[in-house]
């Protein structure tokens, strides 16, 4: 079953912007990620869910898209994400926790795939 979820996880560059993801589903994805392993069990990562059209529009200019496609500014209006989960490291709790963000991001992606997103 886990293998099937991993197979579902892909990099997406276009989304269904008009399909809202309920806040409670996003919060459940974050809660799942919160249970993932972290260096020294420090749990230094913090999360912010953005899921209103205004919040998504505000953050969009700051998102880097597709590192290999240098001339692409990201998805067009109508193809942008309808929600974001921002992950930040609380440096007061722990430094050099950069590997935790990858574990956490994949856990969120797996939780999203399990819910049928992606």
Question: What are these language model-derived features?
Answer:
Residues 29, 33, 85, 91-118:
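Small-aliphatic-rich amphipathic alpha-helix that forms the alpha element of a beta-alpha
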């Amino acid at each position: 079953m886990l293998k099937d979820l991993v197979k579902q996880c892909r990099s997406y560059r276009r989304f269904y912007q008009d399909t809202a993801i309920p806040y409670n589903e996003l919060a459940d994805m974050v809660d799942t990620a919160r249970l993932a392993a972290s260096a020294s069990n420090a749990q230094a990562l913090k999360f912010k869910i953005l899921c209103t059209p205004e919040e998504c529009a505000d953050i969009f200019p700051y998102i880097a898209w597709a590192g290999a496609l240098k001339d692409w500014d990201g998805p067009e209006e109508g193809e942008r994400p309808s929600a974001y989960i921002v992950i930040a490291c609380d440096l007061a709790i722990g430094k050099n926790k950069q590997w935790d963000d990858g574990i956490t991001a994949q856990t969120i992606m797996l939780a999203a795939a399990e819910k049928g997103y992606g």
